């Protein structure tokens, strides 16, 4: 009987491939937060009236939707937090495309459940120069029907990975996150485009947003 010997380099490749698969599975499990069975948001639909809101951005400037819409369309982006590589990647893509968005007479506004000190971390990771709002008490996210309660199992899993959602968001009794949704709002305060998918890995191409800015 002939025995097949695995060389050191071959063994290294096998181990490397296995570790890569395990790492990929860990990331998938870690960042997969399922929606609570009791609360499954659907998001607002096209032609819905966009709820007005006001909040302070990272520059200390108070921003009100109704006032902003007097001069421009608004691309409203909801994201989960600086701990999410999927959010950071997309926010960076939006920053890179910001000049194109501005040529469409539109303003980009991002909304996060995270406290200001964590929004600073988002900016460091993405170079975002557009307004990012801290949605204290989830008022904006609930108004746009994108907020969902995070289940205890997911909260524990994140804590085991040194991600404390309660501390990051300043939430106590219940922990909420948004579905990473996007709305385009017309000057008439109506929603003319929406992207809403509970799968946190899916985001629309920036070109799709540009095509709907009119």
Regions found by a protein language model. Name each.
Residues 137-200:
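Thiol/selenol-based redox catalytic cores and closely related redox-interacting motifs
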Residues 35-52:
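N-proximal helix/coil linker or "cap" segments that precede and/or mark the start of modular domains
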Residues 68-94:
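Short active-site neighborhood of thiol/selenol oxidoreductases, capturing the structured segment around
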Residues 89-145, 149:
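Structural microenvironment flanking redox-active thiols in thiol-disulfide oxidoreductases
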Residues 54-73:
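A short beta-strand-turn-helix
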Residues 200-213:
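A short, polar/charged loop-to-alpha-helix boundary motif
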Residues 23-34:
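Bacterial N-terminal signal peptides
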């Amino acid at each position: 009987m002939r025995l097949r010997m695995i060389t050191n380099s071959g063994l290294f490749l096998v181990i490397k491939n296995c570790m890569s698969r395990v790492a990929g599975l860990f990331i998938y499990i870690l960042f997969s937060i399922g929606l609570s069975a009791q609360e499954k948001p659907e998001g607002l639909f096209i032609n819905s009236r966009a709820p007005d809101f006001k909040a302070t951005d990272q520059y200390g400037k108070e921003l009100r939707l109704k006032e902003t819409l007097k001069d421009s369309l608004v691309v409203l982006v909801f994201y989960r937090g600086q701990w999410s590589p999927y959010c950071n990647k997309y926010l960076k893509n939006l920053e890179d495309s910001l000049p194109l968005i501005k040529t469409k007479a539109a303003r980009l506004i991002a909304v996060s459940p995270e406290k200001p000190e964590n929004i600073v971390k988002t900016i460091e990771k993405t170079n975002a120069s557009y307004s990012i709002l801290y949605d204290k008490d989830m008022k904006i996210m609930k108004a746009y029907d994108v907020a969902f309660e995070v289940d205890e199992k997911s909260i524990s899993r994140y804590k085991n990975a040194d991600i404390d959602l309660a501390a990051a968001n300043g939430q106590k009794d219940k922990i909420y996150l948004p579905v990473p949704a996007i709305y385009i709002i017309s000057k008439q305060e109506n929603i003319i485009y929406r992207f809403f998918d509970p799968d946190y890995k899916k985001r629309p191409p920036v070109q799709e947003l540009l095509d709907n800015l009119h």
